[in-house]
Amino acid sequence: MHKEIAKELLLLAGGKNNIISISHCTTRLRFDVKDETKIDIHAIENLQGVQGTFFRYGLFQIIFGAGVVNKIYKEVVHVWETAPSEEPVHQKKASRKLNPAAAFAKTLSDIFVPIIPAITASGLLMGLIGMIKVFHWFAAGSPWIKMLDLVSSTAFILLPILVGFSAARQFGSNPYLGAVIAGLLTHPDLLDPSMLGSKTPSSLDIWGLHIPMMGYQGSMIPILLSVFVMSKIEKLLKSIVPKSLDVVIIPFITVMVTGCLALIVMNPAASIIGQIMTQSIVYIYDHAGIAAGALFGGIYSTIVLSGLHHSFYAIEATLLANPHVGVNFLVPIWSMANVAQGGAGLAVFLKTKQSSLKKIALPASLTAFLGIVEPIVFGVNLKLIRPFIGAAIGGAIGGAYVVAVQVVANSYGLTGIPMISIVLPFGAANFVHYMIGFLIAAVSAFIATLFLGFKEETE
């Protein structure tokens, strides 16, 4: 079935020669195309499994939903690569240039998307442990708790290495070298930042410079900057070193030069940048909390349209790793925006007279309550416009509430109902306020959508 859909999709997208590159995120298939006029959008939207389509940053994006898109992607890529062509195969890179801010955010998003399953699994496990402790399902010190704790913490311990691997691949470099550089920056001999209150890092004296033996566990910006520089060094060496020596010489020089630069120059600088970003966000949260919650809750769904919301993971990881913060106060806001989309979708389901729209609206709304919003956003609310505005209103109200009562989480990557597992560890009050915010966001979006109404096409 997926193979047939892939063949039709490729044909309706203008054929092999109209496609420059193919990529995907957790719910969407993305085509970078030469000529948008060759795409039969209406026919694609009528394909089995397609929940909606849209253009963003020059990419034609098709929503299939989580668990399906990766299967479709494999078949589409196989058909695309094996189909006959009168033109040479193009490099799989996006052809359109984005402005620097958009390009940076998109790159962050593309780096973190492949890591989401690991983050989600660990986040749910951490939440499960929190629930076990809150409800006393196991005795304190139980070997089961210790075992689950080991399993749940692994992804976050290895997160810098996973990011280094993914970033190197995104930058067109050797991903294993990226993992090595990330491993260097989280080496056990380097002091974990969380220990700063009780320990002082030793230092290396080189050429009059005092280099602190400080690790960067949980700090994403130093990892990203180091791997980016590494990719440039590796590419430069590939243009100089003879091919007969590149297997040995290029990795050796790349790791040695990047490692020294990372410890001496880049990471201290990147760490300062990360601290400034974190302190700025904390300042905004402390001094413009409710207004900031309303603003971020209102606009978050608009950011989701581009898929760039995944770029926030780097910021959230930094907040959790910071010993002076240690919690994630952003993800409750994102969650309010997501469940608001579900509330708006339920209003559409209740009000529409179209049977085809009802069939989409109800399951897509329920999916939004589970934290996956693309089906309801692109399949229903955005097409009708006003429900999307209603959801933004609900997200703003819910976002303001969770900031006002200071709802926090101990992980990221989860919203909606699954997020309960990562708010429970902070106590019953945190959980109750989260659920109140959940209801406020969903109900206010529902009411706002009913009030605004929407115009639908006749069947």
UniProtKB/Swiss-Prot annotation:
Keywords tagged on the record: Cell membrane, Kinase, Membrane, Phosphotransferase system, Sugar transport, Transferase, Transmembrane, Transmembrane helix, Transport
Enzyme Commission number: 2.7.1.-
An annotated GO BP: phosphoenolpyruvate-dependent sugar phosphotransferase system
InterPro entries on file: Glu_permease_IIB (IPR036878), PTrfase_EIIB_Cys (IPR018113), PTS_EIIC (IPR003352), PTS_EIIC_1 (IPR013013), PTS_IIB_1 (IPR001996), PTS_IIBC_sucr (IPR010973), PTS_Sugar-Specific_Components (IPR050558)
Name of a matching Pfam family: PTS_EIIB
Membrane topology according to the record: Multi-pass membrane protein
Superkingdom of the source species: Bacteria
An annotated Gene Ontology molecular function: protein-N(PI)-phosphohistidine-sugar phosphotransferase activity
EC top class, as a word: transferase
Subcellular location: Cell membrane
Residue ranges occupied by any PTS EIIC type-1 domain in the UniProt entry: 106-459
Domain spans labelled PTS EIIB type-1: 1-86
Catalytic residues in the record: 25 (phosphocysteine intermediate)
GO cellular component, one term: plasma membrane
Residue ranges crossing the lipid bilayer per the database entry: 111-131, 147-167, 177-197, 209-229, 245-265, 288-308, 329-349, 360-380, 388-408, 412-432, 434-454
Domain notes: The PTS EIIB type-2 domain may serve a regulatory function, through its phosphorylation activity. The PTS EIIB type-1 domain is phosphorylated by phospho-EIIA on a cysteinyl residue. Then, it transfers the phosphoryl group to the sugar substrate concomitantly with the sugar uptake processed by the PTS EIIC type-1 domain.
Function, as annotated: The phosphoenolpyruvate-dependent sugar phosphotransferase system (sugar PTS), a major carbohydrate active -transport system, catalyzes the phosphorylation of incoming sugar substrates concomitantly with their translocation across the cell membrane. This system may be involved in sucrose transport. The EIIB domain is mainly phosphorylated by the EIIA domains of GamP and PtsA/YpqE.
Protein name: Probable PTS system sucrose-specific EIIBC component
Organism: Bacillus subtilis (strain 168)
Lineage: Bacteria, Bacillati, Bacillota, Bacilli, Bacillales
Gene coding for it: sacX
